Curated annotation (Swiss-Prot):
Tissue expression remark: Widely expressed. High expression in fetal kidney and lung and lower expressions in fetal liver and brain. In adult tissues, very abundant in ovary, high levels also observed in liver, kidney, small intestine and colon. Not detected in peripheral blood leukocytes. Detected in breast cancer cells (at protein level).
Species whose genome carries this gene: Homo sapiens (Human)
Function: Cell surface proteoglycan that bears heparan sulfate. Putative cell surface coreceptor for growth factors, extracellular matrix proteins, proteases and anti-proteases. Enhances migration and invasion of cancer cells through WNT5A signaling.
InterPro entries: Glypican (IPR001863), Glypican_CS (IPR019803)
A biological-process GO annotation: regulation of signal transduction
Superkingdom: Eukaryota
Name of the protein described by the UniProt record: Glypican-6
Keywords: Cell membrane, Dwarfism, Glycoprotein, GPI-anchor, Heparan sulfate, Lipoprotein, Membrane, Proteoglycan, Secreted, Signal
Lipid moiety-binding region (GPI-anchor amidated serine): S529
Compartments where found: Cell membrane
One GO MF term attached to the UniProt entry: coreceptor activity
Membrane topology category: Lipid-anchor; GPI-anchor
Length: 555
């Protein structure tokens, strides 16, 4: 070989060997990256025209790159913002479902109460005239307390309804006996005979069962919509950890630094990143699904035996029927009251000249349960419940499905059909690691996100607890019990405010134990039911001991 050839080739070989491994002889242009970077709204002054050495990079591969330190920082922040927006957009359906349906149900129930009160007032003004108007506060107080209960007030429905019928009996008793004067003490004695005499027939018992369980179901269902709305709103606002932000940057924008701005992440790569970043949200799913199941069960009650619309629409007719019963049995009722409370004093001559009002003989049209009027809320309860049930079913498993929903978005990943020409975190090639399972504990070996599985997110745990408490309330409402007002009464309607199925066969109930709160009477005095419970327990224990002793004596 001529000496001049060696003199040329050897220096060239030395130059080639001195280049970094894998580098091009000529640095590639960053034109595509500049265009994509500028489209994001960033200044082009940050970005070089050609690739530069990448030793300064902290997240992306330290090879020849189009990213400066400033670019990597800005793109890290951009990836965080985009992730937060993705989660919020993906959970948009469940959030709007609870927001819009809560508004519709709340409007419906409030207007239903307003319409029922107006209907009763109009009917009773036409029928009883001044007699009703002089005693209208009894009925106004009834609706005031029903509204207060619905909006979360500390109202014991059973005691409130008992008080209503007792007050109505006092007023009615005076009207059917105008020839007598009744003192406050005498009227108090009269009210004590309400249960014994049953002056209003069976209407109070049936109405108590219907009203209590319908209102318990309605109030609890709306509370459930409120809790679902609040949990969905809170959980959709994520705060990614530093480890998550690094993984997001590497997945979304390290392709920019490698000069591959149009190459999207591999689908499985995206899933592992999202499962790591949303590990705590996935743990919400179990309690969320139980909450949705309980909401669906109460929704079925609202369609059937606990339908508040079918209770409130004819309430004026039912109360009127009770008044008719009282009027028809007035002589027997008066005689028994006089026997128990004593003979009242005669009234002054002017008042005793009045006779029992003829108005009570008026009859009202029978209520047709097929008449289901709509309200200004736009629909009847049946249609509202059917709609919400469909939406609730679609919201199950929403939190564990977030990674799949996000990674299915064509604007985020290359899709499942393009597994070779996608970004795998290092280069444009197939992503090989296996996909992690859902939840925090399953991220211990996540190859993309550094997750501390020993420190569950406190905020998410608070939402889990809120759902658990609400689910328990819904289970009680399903069984006709108000979790805040359960008593130990032995009425045929069963224990607990609003329980009982009348002549129906009760469906299978949840087995659930609640913490019993003391009932509260209209004067806000606590009624200690624990003493009665202790008495029953002591009696049972004593009887058991006696039986055992007798058995021994007989041996």
């Amino acid at each position: 070989m001529p000496s001049w050839i060696g003199a040329v080739i050897l220096p060239l070989l030395g130059l080639l060997l001195s280049l970094p491994a894998g580098a091009d002889v000529k640095a590639r242009s960053c034109g595509e990256v500049r265009q994509a970077y500028g489209a994001k709204g960033f200044s082009l002054a940050d970005i070089p025209y050609q690739e530069i050495a990448g030793e300064h990079l902290r997240i992306c591969p330290q090879e020849y790159t189009c990213c400066t330190t400033e670019m990597e920082d800005k793109l890290s922040q951009q990836s965080k913002l985009e992730f937060e927006n993705l989660v919020e957009e993906t959970s948009h359906f469940v959030r709007t479902t609870f927001v819009s349906r809560h508004k519709k149900f709340d409007e419906f129930f409030r207007e239903l109460l307003e319409n029922a009160e107006k209907s009763l007032n109009d009917m009773f003004v036409r029928t009883y005239g001044m007699l009703y108007m002089q005693n209208s506060e009894v009925f106004q107080d009834l609706f005031t307390e029903l509204k207060r209960y619905y909006t979360g007030g500390n109202v014991n429905l059973e005691e409130m309804l008992n008080d209503f019928w007792a007050r109505l009996l006092e007023r009615m008793f005076q009207l059917i006996n105008p020839q007598y004067h009744f003192s406050e003490d005498y009227l108090e004695c009269v009210s004590k005979y309400t249960d014994q005499l049953k002056p209003f027939g069976d209407v109070p018992r049936k109405l108590k069962i219907q009203v209590t369980r319908a209102f318990i179901a309605a109030r609890t269902f709306v509370q459930g919509l409120t809790v679902g709305r609040e949990v969905a709103n809170r959980v959709s606002k994520v705060s990614p950890t530093p480890g998550c932000i690094r993984a997001l940057m590497k997945m979304l924008y390290c392709p920019y630094c490698r000069g591959l701005p149009t190459v999207r992440p591999c689908n499985n790569y995206c899933l592992n990143v999202m499962k790591g970043c949303l590990a705590n949200q996935a743990d919400l799913d179990t309690e969320w699904n139980l909450f949705i199941d309980a909401m669906l069960l109460v929704a079925e009650r609202l369609e059937g035996p606990f339908n508040i619309e079918s209770v409130m629409d004819p309430i004026d007719v039912k109360i009127s029927e009770a008044i008719m019963n009282m009027q028809e049995n007035s002589m027997q009722v008066s005689a028994k009251v006089f026997q128990g409370c004593g003979q009242p004093k005669p009234a002054p001559a002017l008042r005793s000249a009045r006779s029992a009002p003829e108005n009570f003989n008026t009859r009202f049209r029978p209520y047709n349960p097929e008449e289901r009027p709509t309200t200004a809320a736009g629909t009847s309860l049946d249609r509202l419940v059917t709609d919400i049930k469909e939406k609730l079913k679609l919201s199950k498993k929403v939190w564990s499905a977030l990674p799949y929903t996000i990674c299915k978005d064509e604007s985020v990943t290359a899709g499942t059909s393009n597994e070779e020409e996608c970004w795998n975190g290092h280069s444009k090639a197939r992503y090989l690691p296996e996909i992690m399972n859902d939840g925090l504990t399953n991220q211990i070996n996540n190859p993309e996100v550094d997750v501390d599985i020993t420190r569950p997110d406190t905020f998410i745990r608070q939402q889990i607890m809120a759902l658990r408490v609400m689910t328990n309330k819904l289970k009680n409402a399903y069984n006709g019990n108000d979790v805040n007002f359960q008593d130990t009464s032995d009425e045929s309607s069963g224990s607990g405010s609003g329980s009982g199925c009348m002549d129906d066969v009760c469906p299978t109930e949840f087995e659930f134990v609640t913490t019993e709160a003391p009932a509260v009477d209209p004067d806000r005095r606590e009624v200690d039911s624990s003493a009665a419970q202790r008495g029953h327990s002591l009696l049972s224990w004593s009887l058991t001991c006696i039986v055992l002793a007798l058995q021994r004596l007989c041996r």
